[in-house]
């Protein structure tokens, strides 16, 4: 019963927060905090129990925990939840960043507090559902459900720039996100239905169960078409070039607290879905199209890095750098290499933590000087306590300096791709020079240089509370632990990632 509890706690907690929306703001906060604390505890229980479970084989059907009850039996749909070590890692990442989101929201949300936590918890609940669903219809339901609360968080609590035209505001950006998400959902639904129908034609069994569908027999043309449909649905939400235009706008005008979930967790569901569904369901077509998709990964890396050089909005800059780093992970996924797979997971987790920290810091900068415009900043190192120092630290971490999880992830990706994709590795390494230049310019413009006279009143202003300070220290410690002792993730993720790699052993 751990899995149903894990997915239901955020939804139930969000509903309770909504009930107390107009009564007591503190009650809503403590309900949200309690809900995420329970999710975190359950995630840790799953992790420790999974480590102690001896799996007899590394087949793709080996789940550490599983829960299944019939739902719509006529169409072969069941409420099928299951986790292996890969999904448990993602659950722990979700619970950690969920707790960070709730902690950081204390006294920062001023209106409709209960409704805010309702949207936040339902977003987190949907993400948890995505990570533990192995019935494709149930997965699709959670995939679509994650869009609505995120959309309303953007509409009601997003940043409103009254000096810009209507198409540069939170409502337009939210609508753009919604449209892209609906296109992604539509393509995913159509591709799923074609896969289910194909399985029914060949095996005369109507089912949405992942464990059954991965054995579907089909010709290579049909498999390629369905695989590309799944890939397109997930690529829109990663996002990769050319499906990326919604992300910078969304980050720019979304609430800082909401960005932690969107950038830190929600976008990573697509990476997880590629590894969980795209590769095991369509191994032959994955191998055929791997080089083309890796080429898109290279384009994404360079495009994100180059465009970020010309950004003057701190949140838009972080968004483009995030897009660039997603290119590295995409290359790792389609390299068909065990070491690169593990590097992708380490990079995914570490980068989620460091990006969440940078977005939170951008909120602190805005609270201090009431602007996200980098060109209007400068000399903040002597004006603000702690914030410039943390900006420098997490920007350097994003460069992938040794001793951090980001470095280990990138190094393993390059090492895994080196033998079979040497040119890809060389181009990727050159892109790191651009990313380093971006990060250094980012820190220099904000923290150093001439002091803007309009910020003289900020001298020694301390906008960072003890709680905020401890959160940044906590995120920093996690990244350093992963960097100094990556076996924490490597050992846990080895079995499921080895299963994915072994799918190709019969025909590569």
From Swiss-Prot:
Major subcellular location class: membrane
Membrane topology, record value: Multi-pass membrane protein
Recorded catalytic activity of this chain's protein: a quinone + NADH + 5 H(+)(in) = a quinol + NAD(+) + 4 H(+)(out)
Enzyme class: translocase
Keyword check for Thylakoid: no
Xref: Pfam families: Proton_antipo_M
UniProt keyword annotations, A-Z: Cell membrane, Membrane, NAD, Quinone, Translocase, Transmembrane, Transmembrane helix
The keyword Transmembrane helix appears for this protein: yes
Localization, UniProt: Cell membrane
Gene Ontology MF: a single term: NADH dehydrogenase (ubiquinone) activity
Top-rank taxon, per record: Bacteria
Gene Ontology cellular component terms for the protein in this record: plasma membrane
Residue intervals passing through the bilayer: 1-21, 36-56, 63-83, 86-106, 113-133, 136-156, 177-197, 220-240, 255-275, 288-308, 317-337, 343-363, 389-409, 423-443, 470-490
GO annotation (BP), single: ATP synthesis coupled electron transport
EC number assigned by the record: 7.1.1.-
Family according to the record: Belongs to the complex I subunit 4 family.
Function summary: NDH-1 shuttles electrons from NADH, via FMN and iron-sulfur (Fe-S) centers, to quinones in the respiratory chain. Couples the redox reaction to proton translocation (for every two electrons transferred, four hydrogen ions are translocated across the cytoplasmic membrane), and thus conserves the redox energy in a proton gradient.
Quaternary data: Composed of 13 different subunits. Subunits NuoA, H, J, K, L, M, N constitute the membrane sector of the complex.
PANTHER family: NADH-UBIQUINONE OXIDOREDUCTASE CHAIN 4
UniProt-recorded name of the protein: NADH-quinone oxidoreductase subunit M
Species assigned in the record: Buchnera aphidicola subsp. Baizongia pistaciae (strain Bp)
Lineage summary: Bacteria, Pseudomonadati, Pseudomonadota, Gammaproteobacteria, Enterobacterales
Gene: nuoM
């Amino acid at each position: 019963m751990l899995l149903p509890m894990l997915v239901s706690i955020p939804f139930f907690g969000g509903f309770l927060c909504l009930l107390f929306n107009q009564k007591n703001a503190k009650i809503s906060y403590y309900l949200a905090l309690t809900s995420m604390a329970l999710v975190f505890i359950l995630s840790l229980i799953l992790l420790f129990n999974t480590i102690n479970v001896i799996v007899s084989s590394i087949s793709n059907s080996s789940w550490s925990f599983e829960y299944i009850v019939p739902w719509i039996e006529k169409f072969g749909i069941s409420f099928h939840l299951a986790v292996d070590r890969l999904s448990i890692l993602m659950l722990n990442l979700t619970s950690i960043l969920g707790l960070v989101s709730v902690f950081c929201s204390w006294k920062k949300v001023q209106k409709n507090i209960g409704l805010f936590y309702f949207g936040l918890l339902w977003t987190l609940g949907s993400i948890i559902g995505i990570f533990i669903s192995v019935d494709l219809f149930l997965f699709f339901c959670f995939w679509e459900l994650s869009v609505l609360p995120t959309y309303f968080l953007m509409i009601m609590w997003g940043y409103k720039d009254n000096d810009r035209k209507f198409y540069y505001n939170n409502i337009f950006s939210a609508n753009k996100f919604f449209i892209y998400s609906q296109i992604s959902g539509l393509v995913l639904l159509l591709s799923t239905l074609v896969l289910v129908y194909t399985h029914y034609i060949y095996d005369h069994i109507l089912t949405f169960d992942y464990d059954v569908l991965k054995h579907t027999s089909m010709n290579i043309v049909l498999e390629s078409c369905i695989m590309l449909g799944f890939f397109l649905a997930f690529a829109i939400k990663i996002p990769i070039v050319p499906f990326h235009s919604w992300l910078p706008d969304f980050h720019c005008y979304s609430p800082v607290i909401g960005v932690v979930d969107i950038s830190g967790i929600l976008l990573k569901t697509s990476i997880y879905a590629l590894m969980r569904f795209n590769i095991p369901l369509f191994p032959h077509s994955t191998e055929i199209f791997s080089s083309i998709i890796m080429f898109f990964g290279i384009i994404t890396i360079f495009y994100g890095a180059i465009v970020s050089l010309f950004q003057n909005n701190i949140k838009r800059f972080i968004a483009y750098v995030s897009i660039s780093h997603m290119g590295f992970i995409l290359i790792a996924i389609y390299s068909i290499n065990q070491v690169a797979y593990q590097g992708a997971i380490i990079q995914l987790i570490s980068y989620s933590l460091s990006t969440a920290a940078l977005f939170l810091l951008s909120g602190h900068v805005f609270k201090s000087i009431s602007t996200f415009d980098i060109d209007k900043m400068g000399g903040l190192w002597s004006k603000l306590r702690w914030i410039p120092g943390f900006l420098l630290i997490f920007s350097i971490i994003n460069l992938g300096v040794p001793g951090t999880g980001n470095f280990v992830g990138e190094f393993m990706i390059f090492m895994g791709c080196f033998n079979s994709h040497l040119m890809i590795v060389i181009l990727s390494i050159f892109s790191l020079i651009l990313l380093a230049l971006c990060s250094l310019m980012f820190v220099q413009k904000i923290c150093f240089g001439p002091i803007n006279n309009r910020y003289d009143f900020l001298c020694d202003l301390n906008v960072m509370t003890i709680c905020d300070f401890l959160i940044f220290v906590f995120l920093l410690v996690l990244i350093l632990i992963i960097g100094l002792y990556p076996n924490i993730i490597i050992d846990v993720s080895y079995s499921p990632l080895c299963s994915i790699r072994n799918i190709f052993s019969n025909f590569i």
